[in-house]
From Swiss-Prot:
<keyword id="KW-0658">Purine biosynthesis</keyword>
<dbReference type="InterPro" id="IPR036914">
    <property type="entry name" value="MGS-like_dom_sf"/>
</dbReference>
<keyword id="KW-0511">Multifunctional enzyme</keyword>
<dbReference type="GO" id="GO:0005829">
    <property type="term" value="C:cytosol"/>
</dbReference>
<dbReference type="GO" id="GO:0006189">
    <property type="term" value="P:'de novo' IMP biosynthetic process"/>
</dbReference>
<dbReference type="InterPro" id="IPR016193">
    <property type="entry name" value="Cytidine_deaminase-like"/>
</dbReference>
<dbReference type="Pfam" id="PF01808">
    <property type="entry name" value="AICARFT_IMPCHas"/>
</dbReference>
<comment type="pathway">
    <text>Purine metabolism; IMP biosynthesis via de novo pathway; IMP from 5-formamido-1-(5-phospho-D-ribosyl)imidazole-4-carboxamide: step 1/1.</text>
</comment>
<dbReference type="GO" id="GO:0003937">
    <property type="term" value="F:IMP cyclohydrolase activity"/>
</dbReference>
<keyword id="KW-0808">Transferase</keyword>
<comment type="pathway">
    <text>Purine metabolism; IMP biosynthesis via de novo pathway; 5-formamido-1-(5-phospho-D-ribosyl)imidazole-4-carboxamide from 5-amino-1-(5-phospho-D-ribosyl)imidazole-4-carboxamide (10-formyl THF route): step 1/1.</text>
</comment>
<dbReference type="InterPro" id="IPR024051">
    <property type="entry name" value="AICAR_Tfase_dup_dom_sf"/>
</dbReference>
<feature type="domain" description="MGS-like">
    <location>
        <begin position="1"/>
        <end position="146"/>
    </location>
</feature>
<dbReference type="Pfam" id="PF02142">
    <property type="entry name" value="MGS"/>
</dbReference>
<protein>
    <recommendedName>
        <fullName>Bifunctional purine biosynthesis protein PurH</fullName>
        <ecNumber>2.1.2.3</ecNumber>
        <ecNumber>3.5.4.10</ecNumber>
    </recommendedName>
</protein>
<keyword id="KW-0378">Hydrolase</keyword>
<dbReference type="GO" id="GO:0004643">
    <property type="term" value="F:phosphoribosylaminoimidazolecarboxamide formyltransferase activity"/>
</dbReference>
Length: 518
């Protein structure tokens, strides 16, 4: 009978071409079932159905097709074991040399709106993973193909060597087990959500699985000596994988980190917010501003720190228009992202071909968890943005902020949440004037922010991501002419900071929300 191949695919791409080559060039006998057998028969390719071969019909509406000793014995038999060979002969089982399987589209099914649990359950493949795992386990003797991209490489192996080489079979087995692991994880995650219906979703389960598909091998990581890859989760592109790169080179590791930081800040200014722009350097905002128009917002964000903005990452909360494109091209920028891009902007942007320009309509869509590796494991925390609710804030000083100052405090609070701790933001007229980021002591961050702001601090506001342990930060703010302060509160010495604010006539608001960022 010669060599035998079992083909059972939900994705018919390249199937007929592979099957025809197996039969015509290499004399394979083909086994198949269901829709795959019909596709081959329609193409005029000789095929034996699994039911004909095993003598057992498909049952349970097709739920049981390939789960049979004649199938799995043929796949799992070790060709170098006389006892295995004897067992095959005794049971009239033919060795199966090639298994070509891909799985029911479970992830694609659950991604559809309003899918029912019953519909999802029917897309849980049983026979497919069983075939794949059996063939992958016996890769010393069997080749398993789980993706159409492998078909031509396998045929080349046959044409060059007469059979697939051990290294190729091992690589195929690795890909096969990765596929089944990813598939099972998608099922487990879905059922976990279904189980949690009506309750808070469990995002910190006792066993936490993380898998991703490699989207892109990056040129390098944070530094040229570090290798890096970009992986995506889920069946459909989302987040940055769904962004459209309009121009410029492929994204780098640092670009992606900075873009995500920019997305986080600009997401604070969506919805009914005025036009806004954010400029990021090394994942920290260096300029954030609102404006009457998008170009005004960008120019004000740029003016907030012209030096740091060079080579920065820009995020906009409105479609990129021609006037803003013109302003963007006046300096060197690594990346620009907006929810959309107007046609008038495209020819202007092309004058800066190295500037990466992206559109991402869903700038607001954030991950639900943050993951950080440590030696021997990793940490997972929920990303649960706290709503900005001034009604829940507490004015702790004799002086209350005016409505205009309260609006400014809200603006500064939105920004400071996204600055590395210890973090201080000084703003005035909806424009950051000075940002102190990543300092080991809070008063040091205050001094940096006030120094950067200079005279622009006078009449402005100061936001802190954590409480003031001493009154020195408030005293420094008073000397610079700060009119209002917003901070979490909660220090043992809060009374000293309040006293210093009262002495200077500064309004101070406690949010009771800390926003450390490491």
């Amino acid at each position: 009978m010669g060599r035998m191949a079992l083909l059972s695919t939900s994705n018919k791409q390249g199937l007929v071409e592979l099957a025809r080559a197996l039969v015509q060039e290499f004399g394979f006998t083909l086994l198949s079932s269901g829709g795959t057998a019909k596709a081959l028969q329609t193409a005029g390719i000789p095929v034996t159905t699994v039911s004909e071969y095993t003598g057992a019909p498909e049952i349970l509406g097709g739920r049981v097709k390939t789960l049979h000793p004649k199938i799995h014995g043929g796949i799992l038999a070790r060709r170098d074991r006389p006892q295995d060979e004897a067992d095959l002969q005794a049971q009239a089982i033919h060795p199966i040399d090639l298994v070509v399987v891909n799985l029911y589209p479970f992830a694609e099914t659950i991604a559809q709106p309003n899918v029912t649990l019953a519909e999802a359950i029917e897309q849980i493949d049983i026979g497919g993973p069983t075939l794949i795992r059996a063939a992958a386990k016996n890769h010393a003797h069997v080749t398993v193909l789980v993706d159409p991209s492998q078909y031509e490489t396998y045929l080349q192996e046959l044409r060059l060597y007469g059979d697939a080489q051990p290294a190729f079979r091992l690589a195929c087995a690795q890909q096969a087990f990765a596929l089944t692991a990813h598939y099972d994880q998608a099922i487990a995650e879905y059922l976990q959500k279904v189980t949690a219906a009506g309750t808070e979703p469990e995002i910190l389960p006792p066993v936490f699985h993380l898998t991703g598909r490699q989207k892109q091998v990056l040129r390098y990581g944070e530094n040229p000596h570090q290798r890096a890859s970009w992986y995506v989760c889920g069946a459909h592109p989302r987040g940055w994988a769904a962004a459209h790169l309009l121009q410029g080179k492929e994204l780098s590791y640092n670009n992606l980190l900075d873009l995500e930081a920019a997305r986080g800040v600009i997401s604070e200014f969506l919805g009914d917010s005025p036009p806004a722009a954010v400029i990021i350097k090394h994942t920290n905002p260096c300029g954030v501003a609102e404006g009457k128009t998008l170009v005004e917002a960008y120019e004000r964000a740029f003016a907030a720190d012209r030096v740091s903005a060079f080579g920065g990452i820009v995020a906009l909360n409105r479609p990129l228009d021609g006037a803003t494109a013109e302003a963007l091209t006046r300096t060197f920028l690594e990346c620009v992202v907006a929810p959309a891009c107007e046609e008038a902007a495209l020819p202007i942007l092309k004058t800066k071909p190295k500037m990466r320009v992206l559109t991402l309509p869903e700038l607001h869509r954030a991950p639900t968890t943050a993951i950080q590796t440590i030696a021997g494991g990793f940490l997972v925390q929920e990303i649960h943005p706290l709503p900005i609710d001034p009604e829940a804030w507490q004015v702790v000083t004799a002086t209350e902020p005016s409505p205009e100052l309260m609006a400014e405090l809200i603006f500064a609070w939105k920004v400071v949440k996204h600055v590395k701790s210890n973090a201080i933001v000084v703003s005035r007229d909806r424009q950051t004037q000075g940002i102190g980021a990543g300092q080991m002591n809070r008063v040091g961050a205050v001094e940096i922010a006030l120094s950067a702001a200079g005279e622009a601090a006078r009449g402005g506001v100061l936001a802190s991501d954590g409480f003031f342990p001493f009154a020195d930060s408030v005293e420094a703010a008073a000397l610079a002419g700060i009119a209002a302060i917003i901070q979490p509160g909660g220090s043992l010495r809060d009374s000293e900071s309040i006293q210093a604010a009262n002495a200077a006539g500064i309004a101070m608001v406690f949010t009771n929300q800390r926003h450390f960022r490491h």
